[in-house]
Amino acid sequence: EPNSMWS
């Protein structure tokens, strides 16, 4: 799955 840009 693609990585999320939330941290």
Curated annotation (Swiss-Prot):
<dbReference type="GO" id="GO:0090729">
    <property type="term" value="F:toxin activity"/>
</dbReference>
<dbReference type="GO" id="GO:0005576">
    <property type="term" value="C:extracellular region"/>
</dbReference>
<keyword id="KW-0379">Hydroxylation</keyword>
<feature type="modified residue" description="4-hydroxyproline">
    <location>
        <position position="2"/>
    </location>
</feature>
<feature type="modified residue" description="D-methionine">
    <location>
        <position position="5"/>
    </location>
</feature>
<keyword id="KW-0528">Neurotoxin</keyword>
<protein>
    <recommendedName>
        <fullName>Conophan vil-M</fullName>
    </recommendedName>
</protein>
<comment type="similarity">
    <text>Belongs to the conophan family.</text>
</comment>
<comment type="function">
    <text>May act as a neurotoxin.</text>
</comment>
<keyword id="KW-0964">Secreted</keyword>
<keyword id="KW-0208">D-amino acid</keyword>
<keyword id="KW-0800">Toxin</keyword>
